[in-house]
Design a protein with these regions (language model features):
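Short, solvent-exposed micro-motifs at the edges of structured domains
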Residues: 1-291
Length: 291
């Protein structure tokens, strides 16, 4: 990751402080591949448990639970990429950014099952009648399930009055003066904006990075299918699929940029959620002919 080696030192933050840059004749100097830029660190710990059953009596399933804690001081937009990274608030103190990673999903339960219904030829019930077998035999049902806690986020100020001249891909954190977690949070207000205050100009905020958590995610996808033998190598598969079967609302992250009133106070109502992580329930019926 690149680091701005020309950021104004903390001891010299002031209005019109271009002359206090280490190299005042230049603006932001983002340098990668040097020792100062290689101080991004991460730490991951997890506990994983899985229960499985291979196909037996028509049933196959696998369910897993993962508890994990992922900490770092810098994140990118995705695994194996440097793009989209939000730079350290203070380039001279990267450790101040050490906290929950953007990818720190603390609890995750995932699983699937496939069950061949016990009806029709070769099955336990109603296995002697070819007409009955043609109607209700050979059906199988499958399901995937995901339940996981939300992703972390950081409340940030709308403008930068730190005078650090940090450039782009940078966030100025507020001061945390109270508990930002609401007992009754919702899509119209996810966290307590009154728990934050604008930092004094020329200073950095004391809020810890990624101390807030977004909405949890829950979704179940169900499929029901059967393959009909039409003639020799000609087969017809009929299936019905329901994504987000129970139509459970799973919302995206709230807006995290705070609003400031004309008096300089943090305004309420900025932590609104206007997106979903999982679309509402969709259902479809399809057929596939192979020969």
């Amino acid at each position: 990751f690149a680091v701005d080696i020309n950021q104004v030192p903390v001891s010299k933050l002031a209005p019109n402080d271009q002359q206090f840059r280490p190299y005042p004749q230049f603006g932001t100097i983002a340098v990668a591949g040097t020792v100062p830029s290689e101080n991004a660190i991460s730490n991951y710990n997890s506990l994983q448990a899985t229960i499985e059953q291979r196909l037996s009596h028509g049933l196959n399933f696998s369910f897993s639970y993962v508890w994990s804690h992922f900490l770092d001081d810098l994140d990118s937009a995705g695994w194996g990429s440097h793009s989209g990274a939000t730079n350290w608030q203070n380039a001279y103190n990267p450790a101040a950014n050490y906290g929950n990673s953007n990818f720190d999903v603390r609890n995750a339960f995932k699983g699937y099952f496939l069950y061949q219904l016990p009806f029709g030829r070769g099955r336990q019930f109603l296995n002697s009648n070819s007409v009955v077998d043609a109607i209700i035999g050979g059906w199988q049902i499958s399901d995937t399930l995901v339940i996981q806690s939300g992703q972390p986020l950081t409340a940030v100020m709308p403008v930068d009055n730190s005078y650090s001249l940090a450039g782009s891909n940078y966030a100025w954190y507020p001061n945390q003066i109270g508990n930002p977690r609401l007992a009754n949070r919702g899509v119209h207000q996810w966290f307590n904006e009154a728990a934050f205050a604008p930092p004094t100009a020329g200073t950095f905020g004391n809020e810890g990075r990624n101390q807030l958590t977004g909405p949890a995610l829950t979704t179940t996808d169900l499929s029901l299918s059967k393959t009909f033998a039409i003639w020799e190598q000609v087969k017809l598969q009929v299936r019905g699929d329901a994504d987000n079967l129970f139509n459970h609302p799973s919302f995206g992250l709230p807006a995290n940029t705070l609003s400031v009133t004309s008096s300089g106070a943090i305004a309420p109502g900025s932590s609104i959620i206007n997106s979903v992580a999982v679309p509402s329930r969709t259902m479809q019926v399809s057929a596939r002919l192979t020969f």
